[in-house]
């Protein structure tokens, strides 16, 4: 663990000490090296033990895929922000790189934490760099409103979580995940224990986000720069799912009786957000709402607590992290040229950027879970486990899958086809090799994981 954590920490002084002309290349090279080194965490499917670094940190089959995803996204964020920062002075470029690296360190510590208070601290620490990225480097004035939404939604859920953890430590004298899973708290259906259950899970529900608590997400995505959208869609939403999977293991038998409203709301949210996506005019907002629907599937799978559902949740989180991040990158390539996110004003891109159409097609097919993608593996696994829990869920999940196919095809056809391009788009610059490299680095892991999905399974 430390042989990867220390190089991450050393990237902070490196970004301030390296020469002006070498800043982007140095940080990019080192972060790619860390991303490749993180692959050593992968283990054969029959070796499902926890690797301890110390009593507070460790790596197991649930956290490993998310840790590797975090390490993989950092160099992509640095690479995709190159054009966004081209007009910025050197000190701001260094500050931006430092913010991204500190976010990577916080996420790595959160995913590898085996002690609840360390996990809570790092869970909250990710808020500060993300808020700085949204409010300082966002494109519109509304970024301040988006930052306020993001801050207050997250903090409202975090205070009950802190109180619940303090209460847990007072009663059991430990916050170690392993001890609490082996010797779980003796919970009853009393009001106190019910409120404690809600307090422990509410912060993660908001982070996912659960339908009804999701209003901060479209605002944050739309106003954030491309690096902010990538880390939000790619990793930060998964922090909520990871927290639910970890915490629910010690909340039995209350979860079986109290999870019904949340599972119903998350499954209903798949249909509602899908219908919202069909009526969206803003491209980034469409991708953000599609994330809410897919994360609803993950919430219901995590609360179901069967080995099959948790495996499906992890597969879908990894698949969504890469595919939605790729969609945001593609939306950014259009925005950098047209300075517009409206679907009707940026149509017929195929005639202007023909190579980008291939990436748009692949990303849309991944997002709609076409066979044999890992998105389909994750969705099918979750749908099967939900069907075995309650047969009626097949109506909601089936409708949700149909609507997601509709809005994915609508997004692709609107952006790529539609007659003659508008006049304001006739003189846009062609696509760069850097942009194709970014898309390839998103797509290659998705294709390779199709060949060996056992790397993400937990049983």
Curated annotation (Swiss-Prot):
Keyword Electron transport belongs to the record: yes
Membrane association type: Multi-pass membrane protein
GO (cellular component) term, any one: mitochondrial membrane
InterPro entries reported in the protein's UniProt record: NADH4_N, NADH_Q_OxRdtase_chainM/4, NADH_UbQ_OxRdtase, ND/Mrp_TM
Record bears the keyword Translocase: yes
Pfam families named in the record: Oxidored_q5_N, Proton_antipo_M
Reactions that this protein is recorded to catalyse: a ubiquinone + NADH + 5 H(+)(in) = a ubiquinol + NAD(+) + 4 H(+)(out)
Principal location class: mitochondrion
Record-listed E.C. numbers: 7.1.1.2
MF terms in GO: NADH dehydrogenase (ubiquinone) activity; ubiquinone binding
Membrane-crossing residue ranges in chain numbering: 22-42, 61-81, 94-113, 114-134, 146-166, 197-217, 225-245, 258-278, 285-304, 308-330, 352-372, 380-400, 437-457
GO BP, one annotated term: ATP synthesis coupled electron transport
Family membership noted in the UniProt record: Belongs to the complex I subunit 4 family.
NCBIfam families in the cross-refs: NDH_I_M
This protein's name: NADH-ubiquinone oxidoreductase chain 4
